[in-house]
Amino acid sequence: MSLADSVLAVNNDLPIRTDSPVHSGKVRSVYWLTDADSRRLIKTKGYNVPEDTPLAIMVISDRISAFDCIFHGEGGLKGIPGKGAALNAISNHWFKLFAENGLADSHILDIPHPFVWIVQKARPIKVEAICRQYITGSMWRAYSKGERVFCGITLPEGLEKDQKLPDLLITPSTKGILTGIPGVPAQDDINISRSDIEANYQAFGFEKLEDIDLYEKLLKDGFKVISKALADIDQVFVDTKFEFGYVTDKDGNSKLIYMDEVGTPDSSRIWDGAAYRDGKILENSKEGFRQFLLNHFPDPDVLLNKDRMPEREALARDNDLPLEAMMQVSRTYTGVAEKVTGAAIPLPANPKADIIKILREEYDLIL
């Protein structure tokens, strides 16, 4: 079995029984189960949700995206070995830690395979919940050019690149393109303020005005739980993105939960603690891959300029990245996962065949 065979690059073609189109994201694909299969699993597996809750199989891939494009490597390598399993393992660990600390639930009901979650359908909040503890990345670039107000928050003068911020900052942006909201352009990833959310809370998916306080509390509390755990293994939790949504519990009440992934190298910046104390930045996240791309291609503006998206897409499509660069990302992701979870990350030789076998034999979901 070759290295390329061990990578799950295409994850939207599994023969899972569904009566809806498969939703394919940059990294994950979602298979909505039939009503009959959802009800059967809720009953036979004992999931603690209402019996009419729609369920889905969420399958992660090993694809690597950056700057809104999917990249690939030499030798037919269409993804990063171990990346999908590492991301899921990290999220699973943090969700468990959240539960132990009395925070909200997640959308995950079952974990049949390292690449697979069984999730309940949620009503998503249309906000990318971003939390920052250090000034770096896009915030630093804007600050260095004179900007001081970010998402309605004024930063002090005299901050330096990569330094710790005086307070943990919440800098939300829009999730998807939202129309008809005063003062908010109909574009993806537009920075918004808490005032924007309060004035239009229902348009952003909040059911109650006071849930804005709850979302901010869950964001900050989740950040602090992960930050403390990472500090224990000498890693710095720099910034991250969470997602939230509502589900209905067995008593018919709405509750706010964590969605998607949390605290991973894809959704966060994580720095090596020893290097940071020495005045250096050693990325243990996707940011290292982004920096590689900016240095690898002769015209980095293609990757940064949104007006050059067709060129960027062609660049990603037509260039095989060096194998060593892809394997460095693999080492970063699996290394962080092993530090966080304290366990080796399984790398199945043929993940697709394994997934099909488990979903057939243990869940009866394969056509």
From Swiss-Prot:
Pathway noted in the entry: Purine metabolism; IMP biosynthesis via de novo pathway; 5-amino-1-(5-phospho-D-ribosyl)imidazole-4-carboxamide from 5-amino-1-(5-phospho-D-ribosyl)imidazole-4-carboxylate: step 1/2
Keywords: ATP-binding, Ligase, Nucleotide-binding, Purine biosynthesis
One Pfam entry name: SAICAR_synt
CDD domains named in the record: SAICAR_synt_Sc
InterPro entries xref list: SAICAR_synt/ADE2_N (IPR028923), SAICAR_synthase_Vibrio-typ (IPR014106), SAICAR_synthetase_CS (IPR018236)
Reaction(s) catalysed (UniProt annotation): 5-amino-1-(5-phospho-D-ribosyl)imidazole-4-carboxylate + L-aspartate + ATP = (2S)-2-[5-amino-1-(5-phospho-beta-D-ribosyl)imidazole-4-carboxamido]succinate + ADP + phosphate + 2 H(+)
GO CC term, one of those recorded: cytoplasm
Gene Ontology terms: biological process: 'de novo' IMP biosynthetic process
Molecular function in Gene Ontology: ATP binding; phosphoribosylaminoimidazolesuccinocarboxamide synthase activity
KW Lyase (keyword) present: no
Enzyme Commission number(s) from the entry: 6.3.2.6
Highest taxon listed in the record's lineage: Bacteria
Similarity remark: Belongs to the SAICAR synthetase family.
NCBIfam families cross-referenced by the UniProt entry: PRK13960.1, purC_vibrio
Protein's name in the database: Phosphoribosylaminoimidazole-succinocarboxamide synthase
Organism per entry: Shewanella sp. (strain W3-18-1)
Higher taxonomy: Bacteria, Pseudomonadati, Pseudomonadota, Gammaproteobacteria, Alteromonadales
Gene this chain is encoded by: purC
